[in-house]
Regions:
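Pyridoxal 5′-phosphate
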Residues: 1-302
Length: 302
């Protein structure tokens, strides 16, 4: 973001963005760089046709996540990519939540920049990630970090070729090796099979949580157009206390709060308290979900 945008530029972002996008954009506001938020429904549904009216002469790019890390809603990047193509806009997509779960075709979706993290659906260690970049955007992007690369060491200038121009300093070799092992596992197990299992568990959880009247699902109520992430809000209770009890009393790990995505919570009407987020793995079971539901029953029977 900081290597692409110049004073006077304007970008469009979704209303579900993570602070990984929003904080750089807000920092750039002091440099006369501005953004407009694409409206979404309260379940995160974003309509591509609402974008064209927001495009200005100075609009340079559309930046958005592929799927919400809060509620799992999948955004229509194929249709939005086509709009970017027609209007000659760069299209940057954050796939932190979707990489390793669903197929993404950069060319078909007209994606110029695709960022991913290794520690979620790709099952790698924390602290490793990367990006893919189109040739057109590579010519526009200014590297922000300079340093040793182990290549062209006789030059005081950074190499001008990929990937060295963007990779300064000692690489995170343990992270790279860990991610490589994870990718090998994913290839052997099969991403479609893993995704199917996760969505079956998500559907089961969405069905069973209806038995808990105190719980409100923030986001889509079914498995359509979503990933295996479910956020719950308990309007009459303290979400943090419930999450603490789930961990201490039942051994159930969740993530509670705003998930580094306050704009998403504004969209979902769960600000300022946030939600309790459940993210299902193919290693989970329906029996574990049943234990969670039983835990909720016990908590609310006191």
């Amino acid at each position: 973001i900081k290597g692409l945008l110049k004073p006077g530029d304007h970008v469009l972002v979704s209303s579900l963005e993570h602070n990984a996008v929003m904080r750089p954009l807000c920092q750039l506001a002091s440099q006369d760089i501005h953004y407009t938020m694409i409206p979404a429904e309260t379940d995160g549904t974003t309509h591509p046709e609402s974008i064209e009216a927001l495009i200005r002469p100075e609009t340079k790019a559309v930046i958005m996540l592929h799927a919400s890390n809060v509620c799992g809603t999948i955004l229509p990047i194929r249709e939005i990519g086509e709009i970017c193509r027609r209007h000659h806009l760069f299209f940057a997509v954050d796939t932190a939540q979707s990489a390793g779960s669903v197929d993404i075709d950069m060319q078909e979706c007209n994606i110029d920049f695709l960022a991913f993290t290794g520690h979620k659906g790709l099952l790698g260690p924390q602290g490793i990630g990367g990006f893919l970049i189109s040739e057109a955007l590579d010519h526009e992007l200014t590297p922000l970090i300079a340093g040793g690369t182990g290549s062209q060491s006789d030059s005081l200038l950074m190499p001008d070729y990929l990937p060295d121009k963007y990779e300064s300093g000692t690489m995170n070799l343990p992270g790279i090796i860990g991610l490589h092992a994870a990718l090998t596992y994913l290839e052997e197990a099969g991403i479609p099979a893993i995704h199917q299992k996760k969505m079956e568990l998500t559907g089961y959880f969405l069905k069973k949580i209806q038995e808990i009247p105190q719980a409100h699902v923030a986001g889509k109520q079914t498995i359509r157009d979503r990933l295996a992430v479910v956020s719950l809000d308990f309007p009459e209770y303290d979400n943090a206390e419930i999450a603490f009890s789930l961990e201490q009393d039942y051994g159930i790990m969740t993530r509670v709060g705003l998930h580094c995505a306050p704009m998403a919570h504004q969209t979902l009407h769960t600000m300022p308290h946030g939600t309790i987020r459940f993210a299902f793995s193919h290693f989970n079971t329906t029996e574990e979900i049943d234990c969670c539901i039983d835990g909720f029953r016990e908590l609310f029977s006191v």
